[in-house]
Each structure stands twice: as structure tokens, then as C-alpha cells.
UniProtKB/Swiss-Prot annotation:
The lineage of its organism: Bacteria, Bacillati, Cyanobacteriota, Cyanophyceae, Synechococcales. It comes from Prochlorococcus marinus subsp. pastoris (strain CCMP1986 / NIES-2087 / MED4). NCBIfam families: PRK13240.1. It is a single-pass membrane protein. This is Photosystem II reaction center protein Y. Belongs to the PsbY family. The keyword Transmembrane applies. The keyword Secreted does not apply.
Length: 38
């Protein structure tokens, strides 16, 4: 159990970091496209 946490924690952290960094510019683009028109 502890070994599974040690193995998966860095993987989950890396995935969360990647998703966060992908969504941030995408969300800014979304706001620029949809909220900026009106």
C-alpha cells in the first residue's frame, strides 16, 4: 500500500501539473474568444 502511494503520487502530481498548465492558456483563450466578443 505504501509502495503504491510512493509510486503513484509523483505520477498523479505530474499529470495534475500538466493538466493545469494546459488548461490555463486554454481558459484564457476561451475567455478571449467567447467573453471578449460581447
Amino acid at each position: 500500500m505504501l509502495r503504491a502511494i510512493v509510486v503513484f503520487a509523483p505520477i498523479i502530481a505530474a499529470l495534475a501539473w500538466v493538466v493545469f498548465n494546459i488548461q490555463k492558456p486554454a481558459r484564457e483563450q476561451f475567455n478571449r474568444d467567447f467573453l471578449g466578443k460581447d
